[in-house]
Amino acid sequence: MRKIIHIDCDCFYAALEMRDDPSLRGKALAVGGSPDKRGVVATCSYEARAYGVRSAMAMRTALKLCPDLLVVRPRFDVYRAVSKQIHAIFRDYTELIEPLSLDEAYLDVSASPHFAGSATRIAQDIRRRVAEELRITVSAGVAPNKFLAKIASDWRKPDGLFVITPEQVDGFVAELPVAKLHGVGKVTAERLARMGIRTCADLRQGSKLSLVREFGSFGERLWSLAHGVDERPVEVDSRRQSVSVECTFDRDLPDLAACLEELPALLEELDGRLLRLDGSYRPDKPFVKLKFHDFTQTTLEQAGAGRDLDSYRQMLGQAFARGSRPVRLIGVGVRLLDLQGAHEQLRLF
């Protein structure tokens, strides 16, 4: 049985700003771009979240929700330096580390000799060292696989530790809302709810075949997750080729106008994912993906195109013209240039 730890820094960028400037502590704080230049929130303090402010939100919107919000420009050089320090701590316990972003990573400690192989004690020690050496907090989840470790790290945020033992997996997953499953967004969760499926226990009542018929290959993934199964390894050398966001709609979108209405929300989520990349990547070619009602699909990307709403609207229009029929799924994304540690800064757009 594997022992996986998921570590997630608590409001990482904001935490570092508050660490380095104590006058910001306890205040509604957002790190991000200027509201006058269509900036977005990279992250925010928990005080700001109480007002509804969240990552990837337009800064103008955030200021409407919280007029007293303090806006701080990001210092990516500081964030990257601290991220490297955190990873150096990780390497004292295992070399099997899969970074997900500057502030998040999976660790496989199955073969670690530290603390007699106790993943829980390793996670406790990592949290202690980060707090003492770097003066910020991290949350940790311990479980037999990546899917559950990630859920566990969020269970007692901020500054928390949650452990799911192999013996607890079945009961824990059974009570889990399907909205917690990786890949289940708002639309899919609502679709499942209309089928009478709200928890993983509900998912287990049906057959795998029925899920595949309803959701395609994702149905198989749903079935596995509902049973607490996730065989994905911790990928040490994993490098991203792209970042994207997709949404499958409960009802097919009948025309281009309906598709265009969905773009802003998708791009907002894409912005949030791009902001979490580390400095070894640079966004390059934007692309859109459409899956039509008959399950045929097309992808269109354009070198040199911008990553703004108008550019994606144009690409979406061109992609739609290839089929000119109802749309089941829209995806938006960006191909990445792998800089392997080059010191380039992501643009907050």
From Swiss-Prot:
The active site is at E104. PROSITE patterns: UMUC. Binds 2 magnesium ions per subunit. SUPFAM superfamilies: DNA/RNA polymerases (SSF56672), Lesion bypass DNA polymerase (Y-family), little finger domain (SSF100879). It is found in: Cytoplasm. Residues 4-185 form the UmuC domain. Pfam families: IMS, IMS_C, IMS_HHH_1. Its cofactor is Mg(2+). One of its GO terms (cellular component) is cytosol. The record marks Y13 as: Substrate discrimination. One of its GO terms (molecular function) is DNA-directed DNA polymerase activity. GO terms for biological process: DNA-templated DNA replication; error-prone translesion synthesis; SOS response. Its EC number is 2.7.7.7. Poorly processive, error-prone DNA polymerase involved in untargeted mutagenesis. Copies undamaged DNA at stalled replication forks, which arise in vivo from mismatched or misaligned primer ends. These misaligned primers can be extended by PolIV. Exhibits no 3'-5' exonuclease (proofreading) activity. May be involved in translesional synthesis, in conjunction with the beta clamp from PolIII. This is DNA polymerase IV. The gene is dinB.
